[in-house]
Amino acid sequence: MKIFQEGMAKQFLSVFLSHITAVLLLAAFMFTFVAAVMNKPTVYAAVSVLMSLMYFFGLYSKGNELARRDKLSYTTTSVYLFKGAVLSLPVIVWNFVLWLLYIFAWNFLTLDGQLFSFTGIFYNILYVLNTFMFSGLTTIEGGYVEWYAHLFIYIVPIAALTIGYIAGMYDFSIFEKLAPYIYEKKKK
């Protein structure tokens, strides 16, 4: 069985676009709500946990969807146990490249400890926006990233897509299991 199969390019793009969509939707949430709680560390951490879970389940859903699609007889891709981890590569590479640009900006585009060029400011905003859902749980500011922030930034996409993909392989959906408890039954 080949790790990289024909047709996976579209799946990689789909996963990457799901990551970008999740970041943008959570950013809209952040700018309307999080700004009010940033000075309250406990509330800010709780909001970060909530946003991290929303991000996790967004990627989980994508992994689940791709596994269910791979099981169809007419697709060019096949299922295998850790394909979800392989499908997380675009997100991992994107996060790593943004981290390198962030480090570059803070090491080479600063003047007296402040970013002074449009490029440096752009790299900073891009990285902080891409990782903000974890910002209440760790320190990501001023060119400094806590070591455990990388655990969140890299492990969450791998775990979400892998767990979602494995669940999709076995036709398990956490949303279907929780639906009876979430929706009210109509009375006849």
Model regions and ranges:
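Transmembrane alpha-helical segments in integral membrane proteins
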Residues: G58-K62, E146-K177
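Transmembrane alpha-helical insertion/packing segments
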Residues: M1-L66
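Membrane-helix interface/capping segments
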Residues: F56-L87, L100
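Short, highly charged, low-complexity non-transmembrane loops/tails of multi-pass membrane proteins
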Residues: F172-K188
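Juxtamembrane "helix-exit" motif on the non-cytosolic side of transmembrane helices
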Residues: A27-N39, L100-L111, T139-I140
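Hydrophobic alpha-helical transmembrane segments
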Residues: I121-A160
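Hydrophobic alpha-helical membrane-insertion segments
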Residues: K83-F122
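Loop-to-transmembrane boundary segments
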Residues: Q5-I20, T77-W94, Y144-A149
